[in-house]
Amino acid sequence: MYPDQQKLKLIREAVEEQLTARSLGTRSPEGLFAPIDYTLRLGGKRIRPLLACAAATAFTEAWQRALPVAVALEIFHNFTLLHDDLMDRSPLRRGQETVYRRWGDNTAILSGDAMSIEAYASLAEVADKSLLAELLPRFSQMALEVCVGQQYDMEFETRSKVHVEEYMEMIRLKTSVLLGSSLELGALVGGATVEQARALYTVGIQLGLAFQIQDDLLDVYGDEKTFGKPIGGDIVNAKKTLLLLYTLEQLQGEDLKRLQEILTYTPEERRAYIDEVRALYDKAGTRLYAEAEIERLTAEAYRGVEQLPLREEGRELLLSLFHTLSGRTK
């Protein structure tokens, strides 16, 4: 195992220990806290806490200072997933039954609310209380922007026309700001200047945009075995992804009419037209456009890290995480 991978493993284990130490599974009432414990035990890559601790490592050897922030970010992220599943009526999360399916809508709402509060409780455990005045408004702004992004996402479902620029702004809010804030808050705890931390925030935004575009691509062009779920789900559900919106803007004539016709079908009917829609994406140059955007955004993120005066260990950790995110197949 490479040194950076060993360090990331160490950080991940420390995050898991801190999550366990919060004793969410043993608190009362069980009906409120058991769903929270269940959600956090579903796993995941723990990307956000890893980013926060790696960013701290870029400025100090004492990366453990960032653990309260890292845990806060992970709890908040999982809170958004819990509520997203409820709003989307998703039956499964990471292969397991979602909270609202197992405990009901009301419990999902209340447990999610409690998770968001628990995130703030973890943030408040930062050792340097004077630093908390810097962290709290940034964390709150991030939390609000994630909610704004989710609202836009829901509104897009009922709108007949959504522009690519609007979609990019939505995913910036819904996905990217949490990654950007993970880097920014971790850097601040590590001793970065406000300007250095903000530069890393921008890097996180670029990384988050590339991450979501890659997610859209994998759903249409990924390998089902490595992706972990059926390919073409976004097409079946007529989800307004970058791929669909760009294709609608690029196609003309009969091709455009045909795609618009398929979008009027029911989800079950659209299942038979996944290959045809994929062919229309190819005709519009959508895959090439999306791949070029991922490459551009990822290159900007790497360049942003290379230009900052960081401790070499932290830089290597960040670049290793970026490589994992940008090169993923699932």
Positions of predicted regions on the chain:
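Short, amphipathic C-terminal "tail helix"
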Residues: L297, P309-K330
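Mobile late-domain/C-terminal helix-loop "cap" segments
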Residues: K257-V305
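Hydrophobic, well-ordered secondary-structure elements that form the walls
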Residues: L244, A301, L318
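Mg2+-dependent prenyl diphosphate-binding active-site environment of isoprenoid biosynthetic enzymes
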Residues: K7-A14, S23-L256, E295, H323
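Non-catalytic interface/linker regions that flank or bridge core catalytic/transmembrane domains
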Residues: M1-D4
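A short structural micro-motif
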Residues: M142-E145, Q206-L207, Y265-E269, L280-K283, ...
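Alpha-solenoid HEAT/Armadillo repeat architecture
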Residues: R41, E249, T264-P267, E306, ...
